[in-house]
Amino acid sequence: MSNAHHDAFDKATKAGFIIALGIVYGDIGTSPLYTMQSLVDNQGGLSQVSEAFILGSVSLIIWTLTLVTTIKYVLIALKADNHHEGGIFSLFTLVRRMSRWLIIPAMLGGATLLSDGALTPAVTVTSAIEGLKAVPELSSIYQNQTNVILTTLLILMVLFGLQRFGTGVIGKLFGPVMLVWFSVLGISGLLNSLQHLEILKAINPYYALHLLVSPENHRGIFILGSIFLATTGAEALYSDLGHVGRGNIYASWPFVKVCIILSYCGQAAWILAHKDSGIALNPFFASVPEGLRVYLVILATLAAIIASQALISGSFTLVSEAMRLKIFPLFKITYPGANLGQLYIPVINWSLFAVTSCTVLYFRTSAHMEAAYGLAITITMLMTTILLAYYLIKEGVKPLLASLLMAFFAFIEFIFFLASAVKFMHGGYVVVVLALAIVFVMVIWHAGTMIVAKYVKSLSLNDYKHQIKLLRDDLRFDLYQTNVVYLTNRMKKDLIDRSILYSILDKRPKRAQVYWFVNVRVTDEPYTATYKVDMLETDYIVCVELYLGFRMPQTVPRYLRTIVQDLMESGRLPKQAQDYTITPGREVGDFRFVIIEERVSHARQLSTLERFVMQTKASIKHVTASPMRWFGLQYSEATVEVVPLLLSDVLKLPIKEIKACTKDEKA
């Protein structure tokens, strides 16, 4: 990575500041929509709220944002960039060589983050639309919750439906809209806080600690389940590191944090002024003059849509990284935008839409959604903390110091997890079941890959290159193709899967001028595109190690075209002049790609568990993208050959020949 690129990553600019507001802070920036309402509702309503309760609640929010979001994520986690990319899978790639078991927290963290992303659009958009209840002209319509649900579903349908077109032009508006949003949060919060300056005492952590043991807190430590809603977007902040750069997050976070805290203080001040009024409105909207509420609802809806868009885009990125790390099934990916960072996965998009819509229909109100929200993300944060501990040790921090520092954050997050665990019975099981389903798929996919690696045998190409040369020159066989390309997941120096040589020499001898063996290796860097070539001292065998970053599309034909030209220009590969062509001077022959697909046989080596894993993986493959599409072969000549996973252990079933009777025997 060039120094100029590194400097740009750490540099803050005015444009980067605005862009960061639109991409990074959607989730955490819309938390004021529902956090204070959740606290009041769980306390039993405005009539049950005291000054000590409000001061303690705001103090807990302030110190949660300070300890978890600011110190852990902004000051520590943002340092753990993988070639300027963030997120739990990027962090995992930095430390995975330190211990094999680290795949477990990576899977758990990724699955819970993905499941949480299905709930965020539901709760944010519903909360925004419910704000219409506070608008006198529309309250009669939206007091009927069914109308809230229908409006929410319509917005979600449009939002998910537009994903296939990318966020190109409209994405440029996200930053300015969120700048207005945070400014409104800060200004309205400040104006309300001036009416009750005593709310500023919440900066003192004494009020936070006192509330946890105070009898005025009806829920005890479980109040932290609502407090945690204020920091659910911290993980997304780290995941979006690569989109905006570290410098822009450092520059924008203080502004965002101040505006958010002012909003909470302003809502708290309004609650103190109206706690005896019996008003049953969301403090966020009620704290604004009636004449301005409709505009605030519109702005809140836009902010909710932007937050949802960020979560949807983040889910696409998360899944694509998991696929390239070989811990998730392959799904079709398209790139609707002008850059690789803007991607679209149809299966994930419509799965998220289905889950989000069902969430809205099942829970109906934002209050019920809030009761289930946050449980999954506490697990994600705990898993990130585990990986961060290993990262700090890898970077030279003394193990004891790194362990103590991360143990401090793990303790805080574990308390939040315990406080949120009660949400399981109030709808949190929906997110947990979804997360477990995702983990199950990840485990099956990863375990299946490991089983194949365990049983597949390799042979040396050097031992068979003479046979391959004889086959190439044997005119008794028709020319199968000028170039035959075998794609393999396993190739080490001259060792390749036995099934590939079986396909060339035994199954149906395939005569070609050049035999290619291509292995795509996913690197820890996000945007690598390099290759190595070993021709085994021949001009008819080419072993290619293609190194692609974990965010790069694996469209093999496009890369192979460049490699062929490089080899011919350097004289290592003979030119393949074509007698019949519509392209004058064409010097490259035709290609056929061959993919070997292993299927489970009834071999005795496989244990019952291994057989279950492989059969389940085969079932999952029915709904995933084919290798043809994944490797960009849909417009190329390609063949898939099916071979048993194990060739050696074929059971010899007893069978006896019945001999025909002779004439003498019949007589």
Curated annotation (Swiss-Prot):
The keyword Transferase does not apply. Signal peptide: none annotated. It catalyses: K(+)(in) + H(+)(in) = K(+)(out) + H(+)(out). It is a multi-pass membrane protein. The chain crosses the membrane at residues 16-36, 58-78, 101-121, 146-166, 167-187, 221-241, 253-273, 294-314, 343-363, 373-393, 399-419, 424-444. It comes from the Bacteria. Keywords: Cell membrane, Ion transport, Membrane, Potassium, Potassium transport, Symport, Transmembrane, Transmembrane helix, Transport. PANTHER family: K+ POTASSIUM TRANSPORTER (PTHR30540:SF83), OSMOTIC STRESS POTASSIUM TRANSPORTER (PTHR30540). Transport of potassium into the cell. Likely operates as a K(+):H(+) symporter. This is Probable potassium transport system protein Kup. It comes from Streptococcus equi subsp. equi (strain 4047).
